[in-house]
Amino acid sequence: MARTKQTARKATAWQAPRKPLATKAAGKRAPPTGGIKKPHRYKPGTLALREIRKYQKSTQLLLRKLPFQRLVREIAQAISPDLRFQSAAIGALQEASEAYLVQLFEDTNLCAIHARRVTIMPRDMQLARRLRREGP
């Protein structure tokens, strides 16, 4: 382990806290107001960064399975009314669509950062899709 520099400190003797004098009147202090404690608040952005790290570490699906399955069936119903799906097929569709969306949001975030912003906007997503040659 690397050696670190130690700074000189003034040596201070430990002192016990003084007891209050008994001659003071005990009733002069204001009574405590309700005892309501404020809830702890993190600095803005701390929880967002924690959430980002949590989801980047995990490999779980981000969208719930049943709502995604209903969406797939609704879209398929518009194309052909008598389509049936294996559960593995819907799982593969969900994996692929989530990977696509995550990558799109990463590119969108890069576009926002390039514009010296931290908030993504629709025009960032349009630029990301245009650079990918996906659409207008």
From Swiss-Prot:
Residues with PTM N6-(beta-hydroxybutyryl)lysine: 5, 10, 19, 24, 28, 57
PROSITE patterns for the chain: HISTONE_H3_2
Disulfide bridge map: none
Family: Belongs to the histone H3 family.
Organism for this UniProt entry: Homo sapiens (Human)
CDD domains for this protein: HFD_H3
Positions where N6,N6-dimethyllysine occurs in the chain: 5, 10, 28, 37
Keywords on record: Acetylation, Chromosome, Citrullination, Hydroxylation, Methylation, Nucleus, Phosphoprotein
PTMs per UniProt: Acetylation is generally linked to gene activation. Acetylation on Lys-10 (H3K9ac) impairs methylation at Arg-9 (H3R8me2s). Acetylation on Lys-19 (H3K18ac) and Lys-24 (H3K24ac) favors methylation at Arg-18 (H3R17me).
Residues where N6-butyryllysine is found: 10, 19, 24
Sites of Phosphoserine modification: 58, 87
Tissues in which the UniProt entry reports expression: Expressed at low level in some tissues, such as testis and brain.
Modified residues annotated as N6-acetyllysine in this record: 5, 10, 19, 24, 28, 37, 57
N6-(2-hydroxyisobutyryl)lysine modifications at: 5, 10, 19, 24, 28, 37, 57, 65
Residues with PTM Asymmetric dimethylarginine: 3, 18
Residues annotated with 5-glutamyl serotonin modification: 6
Residue numbers carrying Allysine: 5
Protein name: Histone H3.Y
An annotated GO cellular component: nucleoplasm
Residues recorded as bearing Phosphotyrosine in the entry: 42
